[in-house]
Amino acid sequence: MLVHIPNVLTPEQVSMVRDRLDRAGDAWVDGRATAGYTGAPVKRNQQIAEHSPIARELGDVILAALERNPLFISAALPNQVYPPLFNRYEGGMTFGSHVDGAVRVLPNGVKLRTDVSVTLFLSAPDEYDGGELVIEDAYGVQQVKLPAGDMIVYPATSLHQVTPVTRGVRVASFFWVQSLVRSDAQRALLFDMDTAIQRLNASGADTDACRSLVGCYHNLLRIWSET
């Protein structure tokens, strides 16, 4: 399930984050520092050092925005969120086809299962050529290039890549979510149900029927969730 979540950050927040990243200097390091065994050979980009003060500062801005975003919560059903990371592609940089590692270790040593991958775009599409996020899923190949401040949520099991950036600079944040529901198929069903319930409520549909559907949603979540 791929979900496009618009306007996660406001234009003012995007501008602030970009300004801080553009002036980050030595905080930018070789992106292979966080790549796994299969990802490192095909990864060629730059990344803000994972535990640097600027990564924590800007990551907190994103985490606060996620807490206020009902579409993200509905789609990802987050249990734990890995602290957001930041990357940059320019001058032909790319990240070849790979699957994200199954487990990440949080700063406190707790292990996080990567159920959901997230990319938050911080560069406008007209700022760079190339740099599409290409995701292979059950429905084929999806190419993603979103406005700055918009986010794509997709299963971490997906084979994906970032195509070479041939002009300009592509800046983004990326992170992972351990969901309450580890199965993508089950998350997709719950997301569709939640979306339908919200539309029915907005249309003034029969209250008892809506209440029954809400009960079904929560009972399924109760069966499938892991805390």
From Swiss-Prot:
GO BP terms: DNA damage response; intracellular iron ion homeostasis
Entry's EC annotation: 1.14.11.-
Enzyme class: oxidoreductase
GTP-binding is among the record's keywords: no
InterPro entries, per the entry: Oxoglu/Fe-dep_dioxygenase_dom (IPR005123), PKHD_C (IPR041097), PKHD_hydroxylase (IPR023550), Pro_4_hyd_alph (IPR006620), Pro_4_hyd_alph_FE2OG_OXY (IPR044862)
Cofactor(s) in the UniProt record: Fe(2+); L-ascorbate
Binding locations of Fe cation: 98, 100, 160
Keywords, in A-Z order: Dioxygenase, Iron, Metal-binding, Oxidoreductase, Vitamin C
Molecular function terms from GO: 2-oxoglutarate-dependent dioxygenase activity; iron ion binding; L-ascorbic acid binding
Residue ranges of every copy of the Fe2OG dioxygenase domain listed in the record: 80-179
Record-listed 2-oxoglutarate binding positions: 170
Cofactor: binding details: Binds 1 Fe(2+) ion per subunit.
Matching PROSITE patterns: FE2OG_OXY (PS51471)
HAMAP family, per the entry: Hydroxyl_YbiX
Protein name, as recorded: PKHD-type hydroxylase Bamb_4479
